[in-house]
Amino acid sequence: MHAALLLGFGASALNPYMAFAVIDKLVAKEEIQLDYATAEKKYIKAICKGLFKIMSKMGISTIRSYRGAKIFEAVGLSEELSNAYFGGLRSTIGGIRLDEVARDAIAFHDAGFAAQVDGLLPNNGLYAFRKDGEKHAWNPETISTLQLATRLGSYKKFKEFTSLVDGKEAPIFLRDFLDFRRAPISIDKVEPVESIMHRFVTGAMSYGSISKEAHEAMAIAMNRIHGRSNTGEGGEDSARFTPREDGTSLRSAIKQVASGRFGVTTEYLVNADEIQIKVAQGAKPGEGGQLPGFKVDQVIAKTRHSIPGISLISPPPHHDIYSIEDLAQLIFDLKNVNPRAKISVKLVAESGVGTIAAGVAKAKADLIVISGAEGGTGASPASSIRYAGISPELGLSETQQTLVLNGLRGQVMLQVDGQLKTGRDIVLMAMLGAEEFGFATSALIVLGCVMMRKCHQNTCPVGVATQNEELRRRFHGRSEYLVNFFTFLAQEVREYLAEIGVERLDDIIGRTDLIIRKPENESPKQSLISFDKILARVDNGAAIRHTIDQQHGIDHVKDVEMLHAAAEALENQKEISLEYTIANTDRACGAMLSGTIAAKYGEAGLPEHTLNVKFKGSAGQSFGAFLVPGVNFKLEGEANDYLGKGLSGGRIAVLPPVRSNFQAEKNTIAGN
């Protein structure tokens, strides 16, 4: 991290002389079994690997491009300090000045030499709770109280939990500094619990990263309350698409499409109420999901269309998204495959996320997720947990303001996640602009997670995040516990809405004028924080919450004509041949046709060679996308980019025009 910061601020070379001196001392004392030259080489290699990781997160390939780019945001530094010493680095909430930096430096120096160190430095609990260490929002007391409340079904106990969270001794999150205005009305006038629970979703945790039992418990609970669970980026077993005999459903309503595209088939997509394109996640922005090989058993490999025992690592970028136009095309493709599903895009809270969100709205996403840095840290790299991403309050407020400023807010829903736990959290996030709310860590804790931070090691002692059969038998979570949790949350939201004086959650969305700063005593440092930029309200007459649906323009695509002509093949599996001319304005040709077939016949599709379609001309982007078995496309001409994207068993042939005299090796007839 130190090297990344120095290079990012413009350094051309680094000399970590103290690190080299320490290595020299360790070699001399024979505490490491290497000669100095080898030890130094390995240290430099480790630093370089860390730099490569950071650069790849930002999509930067060369050190020349990274040097001086200042792709950072300051949190807690004053603008005065930032402008004077960091070249005007963005600092949204202000904070400490040079005086405070000097006092801290002296205090740390004095503490460092105050007493003799006995060899081992103390564990301050930066990543996991320690009794006298760093304060954590999830600690033994909050975890045990929440688990007890949801197991007993006790709302009184749940209020003890929220009192611990909302009344903590010192602020941990930005929202801990905030409160809201009150003008109470009768709670009988407030919308019911059931209506509020529709806004709740669980986080994108894949089957593989967590156990089958935990994944299915979340799906059952969310379907029961008419919320939505998320598959994560690991696909979903098709056996879960059909409700069980007792009426419960294991199907996750949200199907995620991540950069690795694990398990993404046409059948998978048509069994979704929402399809989520994961651009980034709050806990480790710029990194793809990473499932170690020892967690990939036969069933997980089958679900992800992979091989057992092989580590499954999603690349940082989607290889078909390098611009907003590319994203718009993927949204169009997915909407064609499943016209019923909403298409969402998951972004990380970061400096500049508002501009990105505006582009996503113009790309016709139905929903935008702003993922905060505080959540989803179970299996994330230590450096990402502490130093990547920013608070959801910062990302959400910037997104809300930018969308309203550009007149785009009305056509998209906004969802937020990042350590949401209580009704107060939900109400404050709604006032900052969110309409839906994601819960991941809290949902796992309700199911039994004790925050051991062993998610990536396959050794979770309570069977939540492991594929070890012996450990999975220790899983005692039940979907009923999650139903209790979300019911209690919604009830607490109702109580807060009554205190504020509104009847519906919709009435406070984007209403930052209702937010006030807590009047409690603050430390001198905390008093320097300013929330003016976060709470600024754009007053241009534009919508401040979702009011209209996106127009995706899929009513007149080529597939509508093909579906009508191929009705006999779809209904009776009768072999049919069709022929069409095609132009480059005909995009995602075959996607809607394939989605219709997959919805009816599943992964098997149609019998071989049932539907044979010949095209002549220049096909648009995503020709033959998600084509299913039994469908053969033959194109005489050329095709634009994304030919055969997500191919799911269909066949595509692209041939040059019959009378062309082009030299094949010198010409291209299909994009990448």
Please annotate each region the language model reported:
Residues 160-401, 405, 579-581, 602-623, ...:
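Active-site entrance/lid segments in N-terminal catalytic domains of soluble metabolic enzymes
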